[in-house]
From Swiss-Prot:
Lineage: Bacteria, Pseudomonadati, Pseudomonadota, Gammaproteobacteria, Enterobacterales
Metabolic or biological pathway, per its Swiss-Prot or TrEMBL entry: Metabolic intermediate biosynthesis; 1-deoxy-D-xylulose 5-phosphate biosynthesis; 1-deoxy-D-xylulose 5-phosphate from D-glyceraldehyde 3-phosphate and pyruvate: step 1/1
Summary of the function given for this chain in its UniProt record: Catalyzes the acyloin condensation reaction between C atoms 2 and 3 of pyruvate and glyceraldehyde 3-phosphate to yield 1-deoxy-D-xylulose-5-phosphate (DXP).
Name of this protein: 1-deoxy-D-xylulose-5-phosphate synthase
Organism listed in the record: Salmonella typhimurium (strain LT2 / SGSC1412 / ATCC 700720)
Entry coiled-coil feature ranges: none
Amino acid sequence: MSFDIAKYPTLALVDSTQELRLLPKESLPKLCDELRRYLLDSVSRSSGHFASGLGTVELTVALHYVYNTPFDQLIWDVGHQAYPHKILTGRRDKIGTIRQKGGLHPFPWRGESEYDVLSVGHSSTSISAGIGIAVAAEKEGKDRRTVCVIGDGAITAGMAFEAMNHAGDIRPDMLVILNDNEMSISENVGALNNHLAQLLSGKLYSSLREGGKKVFSGVPPIKELLKRTEEHIKGMVVPGTLFEELGFNYIGPVDGHDVMGLISTLKNMRDLKGPQFLHIMTKKGRGYEPAEKDPITFHAVPKFDPSSGCLPKSSGGLPGYSKIFGDWLCETAAKDSKLMAITPAMREGSGMVEFSRKFPDRYFDVAIAEQHAVTFAAGLAIGGYKPVVAIYSTFLQRAYDQVIHDVAIQKLPVMFAIDRAGIVGADGQTHQGAFDLSYLRCIPDMVIMTPSDENECRQMLFTGYHYNDGPTAVRYPRGNAQGVALTPLEKLPIGKGLVKRHGEKLAILNFGTLMPEAAKVAEALNATLVDMRFVKPLDDTLILEMAAQHDALVTLEENAIMGGAGSGVNEVLMAHRKPVPVLNIGLPDFFIPQGTQEEARAELGLDAAGIEAKIKAWLA
């Protein structure tokens, strides 16, 4: 869409932070209002992350107004809340392309703008990177400031606390801003803390605080009295004891929607030495009532009519694989009281809402703590329960050591339900599920299953759940299932594939939900088609049989070619000295950018036409 200058006259004056800092301070509330309306107008037309950005409008304006960005370095954690940042940093007229093929990246991205200091997408990385950036800035000696913005969800992760603990030790000059949108600000508490924040961040308090410490540092009783007095004064109104104990100077909480107050506080804090912590209170979805009332639903939105306040309902078509998993989970839990389900803060995305309501005592949302989720599951298994860890492929990467050390080595019966495997789409490089087969396949005693449709997915979940000799994994994609009939649950024979079509000369060994495309290609080329089902253990007998009966083999998977299922087939053939030609088709050796799943598959040659073309070119 084209930018409407008449509709946004103040925002029209700002196409860079340099222009923002030229605006008179009294015009900033109007700028915030226009920025919020423009965000609503843009995202409702294009889709994207929504509620988080509405909540950070005033903070974004204040940060870029006070700090000399991009010289001063501003780091956003995760990046869901960074749409206003993109709008104010030269990307205003392109915001309608966000998350689209060739458009703006959904998260801060170093290759897109000098204002995007750190490429993000996964949570809780900002403080660690910020410490490194602050240390580098100190060695550079150019008086460059470092600011990290992290949400109340992301700060619960262990990595954030590891970073804060380190910052308290080496004491770099940096500011961490906690964007807390879980609590409401009552007028009296908000006003009191806004005033307190400006006092506590001011030069008078800072100089008295530091000066007093220096003067009385040699007198232990007085030093301790000063410390206790300061803690008592701040502790009466400030919930910052934890952050103070980690070595930060805590300020807040303050109203994150008072742009003038934020500017005053940030100006006071800008020159403070050592690690600083500013706690701001915001409302997710601020300024758009439907999003304020239901920020989870409005976290990420499709195109919608903002005047209606409603998101378009699904067409009522085929269920998604997440729902297939959620239905299986509820069905199994109703029959087996030993089932325990775990998610690292992905209840809605993983299809676990119904389970959490029906079985609240067996549902564990461990927050953004993937490492803990896996080892917690290990403990449940040791205790005689049957844990199911529902996790996105891209987030399981964060718990790799726990999968090996705490689960696999001990042969514990933990089942991993790996959602969003393969190409995910609009969230781009940071969220593609490209690597799980590669990084799990090398783990001893791991059973890995790749269903070709929703019925097989259910059977594999059932099989994995009842496997007691070690960990299992079932990986399935984002998106709708295929509409096949669901049959009664039964255990599949471990490590056995299934021939779906008999052909001549060429055999296609398919792993996973590219099966419909593989079937079209097999029909066109009169090839044999095999549903391999298991990546580990592989069906060696079937692979060798296909090699003996055909001139060439093709492996097909929606995972990185390097180290994936196709690599396993190659290893089997080499181990048995069978020099049959093999073409491995899968995800190439680069990070796959954003776009729809269909666009990505077409570009990568993973639709039926692309697969057929690859095979014909290879055979020519």
